[in-house]
């Protein structure tokens, strides 16, 4: 089985981006940066036309990339994330809580991961692949050779061993900012690592940045971290939402993509590892 999994609010209980910002401890400066982003994001979202299908909605989501690019350019220009040590980033790990059942699920996979019977990737638009990796290593039985994190990451100045304010792609062909970017990397991962049959590929995510991968993955699971994202998918004519307890569905509705739903990893473990 090949698992490709989102991080924030899929593996974690809450979004972790604010923890990265708080590590710098410049709340007023961060408020200016984040307020500007949300003003632009809300204006973009309000201008989106109504979509009745996921297929028509995904190109609209792809149009958000200019917002994310502008945001990262502002962050880099301000040097907001300059001067962070590896230790400061690693301290964030202690503040991150994982969604119920994840530790048990991933630890149950470890024997198969060690013999490459199962492969585990994290695919995220988060800005710190290091924090993602250290979180998983800290909370679970995973070792660095058993996972691969595809995300953005802070660039380090080798002369000071601190961040230089730039954000780069890690294990990705370019920065990961939106649903379209994640689809690109999803396809690359599958092409490289898919085992025996494409039906062995599972994608798990929770938000619109995951919708593209949820559409194309042979097995797709929506983590119900936010009701509004479930509601968005439920209105699409080409989507069939099914509780994970019904996996595998014996008869799909023609023309509809099955997306399984759950609220924790206990349900996923029961469906796949029981």
Swiss-Prot record:
Question: Which keywords does this Swiss-Prot/TrEMBL entry list?
Answer: Cytoplasm, Nucleus
Please state where this protein is localized: Cytoplasm; Nucleus
This protein is called what?
CTO1 family protein C17G9.12c
Whether Nucleus counts among this entry's keywords is yes
Similarity remark: Belongs to the CTO1 family.
Entry-linked InterPro entries: HAD-like_hydrolase_phosphatase, HAD-like_sf, HAD_sf
Recorded GO CC terms:
cytosol; nucleus
| GO molecular function, a single term | hydrolase activity
SUPFAM superfamilies recorded: HAD-like
The main location is: cytoplasm
